[in-house]
Amino acid sequence: NTAFVAVNTSESYVKPSGKLVSVNMADGSITGTCDLGGQPDSTAHDAAGSFVVIAIENERDEDAGDGRIGQMPAGWVSMVSVADDLADCATLKTTDVTGLAEIGADDPEPEFVDVNGLNETVVTMQENNEMVVIDANGTVISHFPAGTVDLVRIDTEDERAALDFTGEQMGRLREPDGVQWLDDDHFMIANEGDMDGGSRSVTVFKKDGALVWESNSEFETPIIQSGHYPDKRSDAKGAEPEGMEVATFGDKTYAFILAERASTVSVYDVTDAASPVFKQLLPSGIAPEGVIAIPSRNLFVTANEADLIEDGGVRSHVMVYELQDAPAQYPTLTSEGMDGLTGWGAISGMVADEDGMIYAVNDSFYGYQPT
């Protein structure tokens, strides 16, 4: 009956502050507030609802100096017990995560948190490219670098008028954002990137740091084939996998990964945590930022933050999806099966052959002329 909302009240980057607000979902009233002492980024809770964990990021100012980490104060992870549907502020405790990362050890920036069935919390520290696992007592039980990925068959140039997937990026830092436990031993991360990295991929680790599975550049493949690739982000971080949700529907467990720049949701069957299987690409609203699954109703919901009203476009909104025992309704047009990885967009004309093949031409938006 209670939602726990982390609110950023910082007056500046060097004086971060925030609070955890308890909200009665029946009437929207605020029933309690805890001072967090820093700028929160995300929250999670255990299955029983007995405690809330908060990532206190104390984010860097990207316009200060060289914009890199090393800007105090450092971040940390907080936990607070829940009693009678209220956060008990007197139980608030912090876990120091300084000195763990190889990158910016003195300035950790916890980004996203999730709690497993053993009440262990996994934390992404994005700019630090570090993973941390904390037990229910707030003790760090493991930590390790998120590592790097060798990317091939990607577009690395911002020509704004060409889709050329022949580029490579070797040793690209993962710099994960979203994270979700797949079971009590495995978790998946969405490697958005923020400072030096962004591997355009999703990865599964065991909590002891063992690398189990990596999508590499194949995460972007269905996005490219379905006409969703954001070409203007080619010289940055591509489709940018960011938010994530994992939930069990019947006897299947699915991961839903939001690609902020492509405005898509990639659905993976992660019933076998060590071997995720791509199932479907879904269209989202513009710039999906949040996602929640409602398995009891066979639903999941995305929150899409882009507000394009000044340009005559759509407002920020939510989208609701329902799991059905039926063929996928999307995508309706794909370049899957073509020789080579083929992106497309701005279709101007199409004609169908008798064998079911559609021949199409891009309009002048993709008018790049090779030299």
PLM regions with names:
Residues 1-371:
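Sequence/structural signature of beta-propeller domains
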